[in-house]
């Protein structure tokens, strides 16, 4: 939009001069009691904020588009713009309009971006707001991130292929990077995680001289920067950007934590999402996540630190055990736990108060909050020292009580100060002799005004006469029109204003008193502001001391929270090992249990160990609880690594370097990727990065493609993990063929979810049992989902037809030479009938089918042997029961329980008949088709007896 600057009014010209320096921002331009926006900014903001778009005369032929928001409520509008990815520049009046000569001087005092928000109303109390910078040099990257509201600063260097995982862990709200080409690789995670990527990089951000403005040379020399200067460069980008937006150097950024990402368990973006660590998959809400269950923190500082614990599981055994020991001390001491909770709930957000002090935006009320928090420190320290918590005592042994800071605020600031620092009523009179004297004058002035009011009432004869005040012409005498005619007014009364029902006057005496009073009140406000700034600056110089105390409080709060959760939910202290054995007894899913209650949750064991079983194949119908079981195993392992007690009867957890999850299905339509492609990409990531020390959760791999492709891929993936990676793996599948892997590899074991058939329906028992499932129960599940009866009945008919006629489902092979000849003969006959043009494709298809049939026989033969063994045992039981028929009756309840696990049921009256028929079967001399038909008939008879 081309604008002729020469035609603009002076004010509008000033606006555009400021706007041109902040072209990528929406400029909030202060005009009196409003922030106004003009031209393109007005068009954008009015739409985003849903406010009226008007116009203003600007010197051009057309009025300038304009919209505005009230100064006193601007924060809510700024918040909405920032949340929608806009940057907001605050153009403030730098002088008093009443004393300004000409146009009021205006300047941008700060730029608000997603990563530089300071206002508490725009921030989540228990979540950090990180600004992250990246400096890329080749494939190496320096990464630094800071929460400017607390001053927390962390830095590391890593390879570019690790950056996405690190960003997923940190979850910044804004990223700034020197390599604009690399931005494209960040688009996906930025979209998924709602991260603002700042593309307005300036080479000035690389000026490392900024480091000396924040840190002494001695401190910088002690820091372990990388040899290539990656961290120095990324830190310089960050600090220069902060200075450019906030227009000042801040003292709360005074300590850098340089860390190595290998110190923590690696969790990729998919795993964090699938396990719902800090927010749910649906709705992105904290409620329903692991963090929601664990968070009983009393302070905002503790809440933020707990989130960091969950996001960054430790892999150092001694550090994990130290946390566990502290939590155990608190959990086992009910009185200590309750006392600490009572103290902590009265402590304010000290970290963010420090941030506001550093940016000169702290209010008097917030300093009172700081004082009240410091007041709790002696009690906190004494409570811990009087307990038996030996390790916890170490945390507070050298904790600064900040007595000097407390005394300063207590002596100076009123308990109930005004909200704004320039309106007075902030400082106690006894803190300053000058202030005390001025307040006496002000107080007496009010008395003098009252005296004048009483005297003028007598003089004029108007009893309702009153003296008021406004900012336009100060003190005035008001007489209502009803009393005007009887009023005896002399020449000292000077009319100033006529209202509909009253007249207002001033007198020389009133003006003389006014000057004394107003001078005193203005001086009081000015002096109070000066004193407040001095107090703020004194505290500012001690921010590092206060921040250390805040960090100690946050740690104690997290320990108390985890101890409280462990006590309430009956969690146990896990053992931590380095021998790669995972052994969970009666484990529970913490989130699901929190919803349904411990008494309604069915616990399950998980055992994974080298030499015995490193891969568990889990079969069972949909909705039976496979995914919940696998997720709970991963979550219990992760909880142990953050130093938390876990929901189990006992748990022995190995140090894991990574947890991978491939759970659920979703299309990535924005990238043109199908469910199956997304699945394969995630599996590829796992196979490339998993190690022997990893835990892998795979759910229904291969379901996004054809049956044969799916089985082949799933089989091959399990083989690859077993032979090449050898990591602990839970592999859920509906391909029952994969249970044959147990025979191929001794470290692969079959498990399934127990199901009880109940007439036409099924009951999910939610219990993991050591055997593969023999049915998928798909139609049963469809019935539970309330599909139309017509659909269900038709599905049953089709299923029976498929089971009867399809080679793959109907033929069982012994695997010996004779039966292989039968299959080969059948295949030859089939091939003769095939059209010559389709010969090759048909042959390959039948060849694959033949191989699957051979494999399937082993599964069927194994199940038959088990079945036959159970039949024989059952026959013996029937004989025994007949002998003791007069002594006892069959316990029908026990019989039903047996049905749930074996899925075999016989009426006690007819058991001997059916058993005799089973014993007379000569299964090994039957053809495969005869064998399967005989088994089918026996199953049918058993069902008839049951019904």
From Swiss-Prot:
One of its GO terms (molecular function) is ATP-dependent DNA damage sensor activity. The keyword DNA damage applies. Keywords: ATP-binding, DNA damage, DNA repair, DNA-binding, Nucleotide-binding. SUPFAM superfamilies: DNA repair protein MutS, domain I, DNA repair protein MutS, domain II, DNA repair protein MutS, domain III, P-loop containing nucleoside triphosphate hydrolases. InterPro entries: DNA_mismatch_repair_MutS (IPR005748), DNA_mismatch_repair_MutS-lik_N (IPR007695), DNA_mismatch_repair_MutS/MSH (IPR017261), DNA_mismatch_repair_MutS_C (IPR000432), DNA_mismatch_repair_MutS_clamp (IPR007861), DNA_mismatch_repair_MutS_core (IPR007696), DNA_mismatch_repair_MutS_N (IPR016151), DNA_mismatch_repair_MutS_sf (IPR036187). One of its GO terms (cellular component) is cytosol. ATP binds at residues 620-627. It holds the Pfam family MutS_V. This protein is involved in the repair of mismatches in DNA. It is possible that it carries out the mismatch recognition step. This protein has a weak ATPase activity. Belongs to the DNA mismatch repair MutS family. This is DNA mismatch repair protein MutS. It comes from Clostridioides difficile (strain 630).
């Amino acid at each position: 939009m081309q604008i002729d600057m020469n035609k603009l009014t002076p004010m509008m010209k000033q606006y555009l001069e400021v706007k041109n320096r902040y072209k990528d921002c929406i400029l909030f331009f202060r005009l009196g009691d409003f922030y106004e926006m003009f031209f393109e900014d007005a068009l954008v903001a009015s739409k985003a904020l849903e406010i009226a778009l008007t116009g203003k005369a600007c010197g051009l032929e057309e009025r300038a588009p304009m919209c505005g928001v009230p100064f006193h409520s601007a924060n809510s509008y700024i918040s909405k713009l920032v949340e929608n990815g806009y940057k907001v520049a605050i153009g403030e009046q730098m002088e008093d309009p009443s004393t300004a000569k000409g146009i009021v001087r205006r300047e941008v005092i700060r730029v608000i971006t997603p990563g530089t928000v300071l206002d508490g109303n725009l921030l989540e109390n228990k979540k950090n707001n990180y600004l992250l910078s990246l400096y890329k040099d080749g494939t190496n990257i320096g990464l630094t991130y800071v929460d400017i509201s607390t001053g927390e600063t962390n830095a590391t260097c890593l390879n570019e292929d690790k950056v996405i995982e690190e960003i997923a862990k940190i979850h910044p709200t804004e990223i700034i990077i020197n390599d604009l080409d690399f931005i494209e690789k960040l688009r996906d995670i930025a979209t998924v995680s709602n991260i603002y990527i700042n593309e307005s990089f300036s080479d000035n951000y690389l000026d490392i001289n900024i480091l000396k403005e924040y840190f002494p040379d001695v401190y910088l020399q002690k820091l372990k920067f990388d040899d290539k200067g990656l961290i120095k460069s990324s830190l310089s980008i960050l600090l220069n950007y902060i200075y450019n937006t906030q227009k000042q150097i801040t003292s709360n950024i005074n300590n850098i934590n340089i860390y190595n990402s290998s110190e923590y368990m690696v969790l990729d973006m998919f795993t964090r999402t699938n396990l719902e660590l800090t927010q749910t998959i649906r709705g992105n809400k904290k409620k329903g996540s692991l963090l929601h269950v664990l968070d009983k923190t009393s302070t905002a500082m503790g809440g933020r630190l707990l989130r960091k614990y969950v996001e960054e599981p430790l892999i150092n055994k001694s550090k994990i055990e130290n946390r566990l020991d502290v939590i155990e001390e608190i959990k086992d001491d009910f009185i200590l736990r309750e006392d600490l909770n009572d103290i902590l709930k009265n402590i304010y957000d000290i970290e963010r108060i420090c941030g506001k002090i550093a940016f000169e935006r702290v209010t008097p009320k917030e300093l009172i909050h700081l004082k009240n928090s410091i007041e709790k420190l002696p009690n906190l320290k004494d409570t811990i020292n009087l307990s038996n918590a030996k390790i916890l005592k170490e945390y507070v042994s050298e904790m600064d009580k900040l007595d000097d800071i407390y005394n300063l605020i207590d002596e100076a600031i009123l308990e109930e100060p005004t909200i704004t620092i320039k309106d007075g009523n902030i400082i106690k009179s006894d803190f300053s002799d000058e202030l005390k004297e001025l307040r006496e004058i002000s107080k007496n002035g009010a008395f003098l005004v009252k005296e004048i009011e009483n005297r003028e009432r007598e003089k004029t004869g108007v009893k309702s006469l009153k003296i008021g005040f406004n900012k336009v012409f100060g003190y005035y005498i008001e007489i209502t029109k009803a009393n005007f005619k009887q009023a005896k007014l002399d020449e000292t009364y000077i009319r100033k204003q006529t209202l509909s029902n009253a007249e207002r006057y001033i007198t020389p005496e009133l003006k003389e008193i006014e000057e004394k009073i107003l001078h005193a009140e203005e001086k009081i406000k000015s002096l109070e502001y000066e004193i407040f700034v001095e107090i703020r600056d004194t505290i500012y110089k001690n921010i590092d001391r206060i921040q250390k105390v805040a960090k100690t409080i946050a740690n104690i709060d997290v320990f108390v929270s985890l101890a409280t959760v462990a006590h309430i939910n009956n969690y146990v202290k896990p053992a931590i090992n380095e021998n790669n054995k995972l052994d969970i007894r009666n484990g529970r899913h913490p989130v699901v249990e929190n919803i349904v209650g411990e008494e309604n949750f069915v616990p399950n064991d998980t055992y994974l160990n080298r030499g015995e079983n490193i891969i568990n194949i889990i079969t069972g119908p949909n909705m039976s609880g496979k995914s919940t079981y696998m997720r709970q195993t991963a979550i219990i392992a992760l909880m142990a690594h953050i130093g938390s007690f876990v929901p189990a009867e006992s748990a022995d957890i190995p140090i894991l370097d990574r947890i991978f999850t491939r759970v659920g299905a979703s299309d990535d339509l924005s990238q043109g990727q199908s469910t199956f492609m997304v699945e394969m990409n995630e599996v590829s990531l796992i196979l490339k990065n998993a190690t022997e020390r990893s835990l892998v959760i795979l759910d229904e791999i291969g379901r996004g493609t054809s049956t044969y492709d799916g089985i082949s891929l799933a089989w091959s993936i399990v083989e690859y993990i077993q032979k090449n990676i050898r990591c602990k793996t839970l592999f859920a599948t509906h391909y029952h063929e994969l249970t044959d892997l147990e025979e191929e590899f001794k470290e692969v074991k079959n498990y399934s979810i127990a199901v009880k058939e109940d007439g036409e329906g099924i009951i999910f028992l939610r219990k993991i049992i050591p055997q593969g499932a023999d049915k998928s129960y798909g139609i049963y599940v469809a019935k539970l989902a309330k599909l139309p009866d017509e659909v269900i009945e038709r599905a049953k008919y089709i299923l029976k037809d498929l089971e009867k006629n399809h080679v793959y489902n109907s033929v069982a092979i012994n695997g010996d030479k004779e039966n292989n000849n039968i299959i080969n003969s059948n295949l030859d006959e089939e091939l003769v009938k095939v059209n010559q043009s389709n010969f090759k494709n048909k042959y390959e298809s039948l060849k694959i089918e033949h191989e699957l049939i051979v494999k399937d026989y082993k599964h069927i033969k194994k199940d038959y042997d088990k079945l036959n063994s159970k039949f024989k045992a059952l026959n013996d039981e029937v004989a025994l029961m007949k002998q003791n028929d007069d002594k006892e009756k069959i316990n029908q309840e026990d019989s039903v329980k047996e049905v749930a696990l074996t899925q075999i049921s016989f009426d006690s009256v007819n058991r001997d008949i059916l058993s005799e028929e089973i014993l007379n079967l000569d299964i090994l001399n039957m053809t495969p088709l005869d064998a399967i038909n005989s088994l089918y008939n026996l199953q049918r008879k058993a069902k008839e007896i049951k019904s």
